[in-house]
Every structure is written in structure tokens, then in C-alpha cells.
Swiss-Prot record:
It is a multi-pass membrane protein. PANTHER family: AMINO ACID TRANSPORTER, VACUOLAR AMINO ACID TRANSPORTER 3. This is Vacuolar amino acid transporter 3. Belongs to the amino acid/polyamine transporter 2 family. Residues 1-71, 135-170, 258-294 are annotated as: Disordered. Residues 15-24, 141-153 have a biased composition (Low complexity). It comes from Saccharomyces cerevisiae (strain ATCC 204508 / S288c) (Baker's yeast). Residues 1-14, 28-38, 154-167 have a biased composition (Polar residues). Pfam families: Aa_trans (PF01490).
Amino acid sequence: MNGKEVSSGSGRTQSNNNKKNNNGGSTGISHASGSPLTDGNGGNSNGNSRSRSRSRKSSGTTGGLLKKPPLLVNNEAVHASVPDASHTSCNNGTLEVSINNPEPHVVDAVARHLIRNPSNSLQLQGGDITRDLYKWTNDHPSSPSQYQYPSQPALSTSIPSQAPSFSNRKRSMSFSAASIASSSHLNNNSEANGNPLAAIGLAPAPMTHEEIRAPGGFRRSFIIQKRRKHNVDAPIPNFFTRNFIEFLTLYGHFAGEDLSEEEEEEEETEEEPEEEALETESTQLVSREHGRHPHKSSTVKAVLLLLKSFVGTGVLFLPKAFHNGGWGFSALCLLSCALISYGCFVSLITTKDKVGVDGYGDMGRILYGPKMKFAILSSIALSQIGFSAAYTVFTATNLQVFSENFFHLKPGSISLATYIFAQVLIFVPLSLTRNIAKLSGTALIADLFILLGLVYVYVYSIYYIAVNGVASDTMLMFNKADWSLFIGTAIFTFEGIGLLIPIQESMKHPKHFRPSLSAVMCIVAVIFISCGLLCYAAFGSDVKTVVLLNFPQDTSYTLTVQLLYALAILLSTPLQLFPAIRILENWTFPSNASGKYNPKVKWLKNYFRCAIVVLTSILAWVGANDLDKFVSLVGSFACIPLIYIYPPLLHYKASILSGTSRARLLLDLIVIVFGVAVMAYTSWQTIKMWSQ
């Protein structure tokens, strides 16, 4: 049908092919195939000529795209402009169509491209698509000063003669938040000017219907509605809040294991609308694996996270540990532990990169089988329970001394066991928290109190030495009787191995992890050695297991620090217990047992968590009378395997598979033998001294 025109006025049929269809199925009409539409005189209107290029991509028939602009005509206009004809004919390639008695298939084909109502362009085929495209083009010219088309695409037969030229725009412009900002600005102005909806307590519409019909408008409207629903302004989290939430999230992936659960996601969506308000129109529709954060940490932030993970309560046990080992042996042992620990930490990260998995236990499963994974996770759970029990005794001891001095109670009037089990009332509600980020407030307070306590320990120890001098008469360079107790306490102090993998994963530049870790280990070694040596030099053999008890108990400064430090450890204990609870919970309950939709399963898990808290308190009560020996046993039996046995074992197996040098393999074997020997000897010695 190419090259044919629709005309009228001839009154006769000149072709035998008047009933043939074109290839696309639009029968007998050349409008869909590319030839111009003319009026009764066979001429093409100037308006149609201009609009041809604009409408070429607008819509199409069944056989192809619509090549010509639609005709804005009605029935009266058709009958007025076309003479009477009773038949169709074809002469010299021209098809004549009768208006009074047209062929049915011709009427059907023409009707597809006629707009009965000029204000409704959706009657066109594909109009629901081209409408938004035209509108977006009209609303986004190459410059603001250029001509703006009407809000609806120009679908009439006349197009303005002077059309502005549009430069090619990047696709990112379609994600511009200008429409949202302008809509919010208009809504705010309308409210200020006495919006009738606001007057009756109804919020104005976040977006107009034209903005919603724009590409991506529905998603933008949905995001704004969620903001309005929860009345959230979506402020940018401040530095401390953002960093502490990220730090707490690392405990959800302790030792690289995924310890989060489905209930956590449910609580985030139902009880934390602030997270929803942080969504934008460019936020991905389907989130990544829960718990994984797309935002990477800088090197400085990684250093701060490492410092937080290593510097904790264990530093206050070091003065008594220096007395057990002797100041010379203790300083040398701490320095050696820092060096060997750094090598084992690097071996663990190297093995993770070689094996290609993130979990500490998963590395053991791939290299040695499921029994190795069970051993690793058992050590993690046991060490975290040991930390929590030691923290419980530490808190109970400080609270007992504080109460006796502040309330002038008789010493021993309230037993230490009472303070231990009273903490269960606080630990149980906190342990039931599924979303670990909700502990951000308690963790922030705890870290601030710990920092204040450390500053006070340094300041008062220096002041005490300046006034009374060094207690050199009672200081020992090497304590032959109790030196093995120091090793377990020193290992207990380096308690941050579980956070190494998630911190390394969160770094924007993972290649900077080694130098960052080396710098942190140097800083930590200086803090540990200086604190232990300084307090031991100040108090000598009279140093207490908790060094705060050596400070004058009749001053408000000491009482305040004791209370704040006790509260700090009290609030941070549930955070230490969280990985152990999740590991034991995963072993006890089936993988598909979720309390998200089953209240019975959820309450069974709640009872299980309460049982773990009570068990930890009982363990703390057992070791309360000899806290230094209890801490040493936890460090020897639970922490030494995690640092000095499992990492070289994993690295040895992975290095054999990758072809590492024999010298490096021999070094791994030496560290393994050293770790096993130290663990066995120190654990046996600690139990022996405890029994005596």
C-alpha cells in the first residue's frame, strides 16, 4: 500500500485490490504504512507536515508503529470536508474511500487513529506510554528559559512552528528529586497560606497527579507517603549515632558468622520508621542480604572500630595480672602476645581471602569439615559466655563497694551473690532484643563511662606515684608462683578477634587493613603495658583484682567512677552475650523455626535466652571469689584456641592447597604447637591453684 493517498471526490472504483490488507493488519489504509493523509483536494495540510516528525514514535497499529500524527476530527468535520461518495476506487496509485458507504474494515482501521475528544490523548494506541514521555520532555527543556510545551503532549494536527531544540540528557536526570522538592515546597507554602486541608487536620497531597504520572513518579509518591505516615523528617544521623550503630551491627556478624534473624527485619520495618524515611527514589527496591551494609567504612573509621573492639574491661584486670607475673615478665609477655596475635590475625584474614568465605566457622568447615566448624563456634560461644560472667562479677564487686561506702552499710551486709543475680533482672529484657542496633544507646553510654574510668585510672595512678613514690619494695620482676595466671589474663585482654572479619569486610579499601591493624596493635600494646605497669608501680603487691578498689573510697570522684564503670559493664554485658546466644540458638532450634509468624517458637526462643542468662549468672557466682583465676581460665581455655590454634591451622591447610613456601608452613606448625602447649599448661595450672 506504499505510495497511496486517502482522498475523496472521484466517485468510482479504479482498482481490484481495494479489499487487500497491509502487512500489519490495518486494512486498506495507507496511514499506518507511511503515506500522507490528505483532505478532499489531495493536498497535505501544513500542520500535518510539521507534526509528522513529532508523532512518528507515538503509537502503532498491529502491524507497526504509527508513522503519522493523529487527526483531531469529529464526525461533523469529516462529513463537511469530504464530498459524497458511494464507492472506493484506485487510480494511478490513489485509493478513494467512500465516506457515506465505506468498507467496514476501512472504518475500523481509521477509527483507531482518530481522537474523538481532543483533551484525551489516551484514546490513541500506546497513548498511556507516549503521554508521559511527551510530558517529561515538555517539563525538562535544555534550559529553564526555553519554551515550555503544555502539560499534555501536542497531539493535534498543528504544532508550534518554533519548537525549541533539546540536547541529549543523561538518564540520571529522570531520577532528579526536583519534582519532590518542588512539590514539598508548594505543599509547605500552601500550608503556610492557610491550606483548607491543613485547616481541618489533613495533610496536603505530597505530589500532584501529573507528577505521579511522570516516569518514576509512583515510587517517589510512595516514599513521600511513608515519610508523612510516620511524621519523620529523615535527619542525617550524627557522627556518634551512625558509628555506634555500625559498630553494633558488627556483632550481628561476629567472627563473620551471620547471627541475624528474620524477627530482626520485621522489627526494623514495624518499629523503626526512621529507617524507612532514609529511603530515596534511587534506593534499590530489593535490599541486599540482610545485615550487609552497602556503605563502606574509611580507613580511619576502621581504626576506631578496631580500637573499640580491643580496649574494654580487660585492661582493668592487668594491674593484678602484673603482680601475678612480675612487671618484667608481664611487659615482655604482653609485647610478645601482641606480635603473635597480629600474625595470627593476619593469617585469619589471608585464609578468608583464599577460601572465599566470610565466616570463621565456615572456613573450618570447608578446610577440615563440620567438626572443625563446631569446635570454632563452641570456642566463640564459650569465650563470650566467659566474658559475660567475668563482667557480671566485675559489676557486682564495684556495686557492692559503692553501696557500702555511699550508704554507709556494714561490709558484707549484702552478699556478692545478691548483686550478681540482681543483674539478671536487667540482662533478661536486653537479651530478648532481636535487633542489636537497639542496644546502641546502652553501648554508647557504656563506652563513654569506660573512657572516663580509664582517664581517672591514669590520672590518679600518676598522682599517687607523684605523692607516695613507686612501690619498688613489693614489686617483683618475675613471680615464680603465679606467672601462669598472667598468660590467661593477657589473652583475655585481646578479646577483639571476633570483630576482625566484619571490620575488614566493611572497609572501603581492604588493602589498608594490615597497616591499620598493625597500628592498632601498637596502640593497644602501649595502653595495656602502661596501665598495668603504672598501677602496679603505684600500689605494689597490694593491688586489687579490680584496680578501682585501690583508690580512696571516701572521695566523690572514686565513688562516681566506680558507679559509672559498673553501669558501663552492666550495659555492655548483653552485647557480649549476643553472639553466644545466637550460636547456641541456631544449634538448638531448626533452621526453619522462625518466631516471625509463630508466637510459640518465639516464646521458646525467649525462654532459651533467659536460661542462658541465668546460666551465665550461675557461672559468675561460682567464680566470684577468685575473679583473677576465673578470668585467667577463660583466657586460657577459650581464647587461646581462637587466636593461637585455629587461625594457623586454617592457614596451614589453605596454604598447602595454594602452594605456600615451606618456611611459612613451618611457622604455622610452630604457632599451633605453642598454642596447644600454652593452653594445656595454663589451664591446668589455673585449675590447680583455684582448687587449692
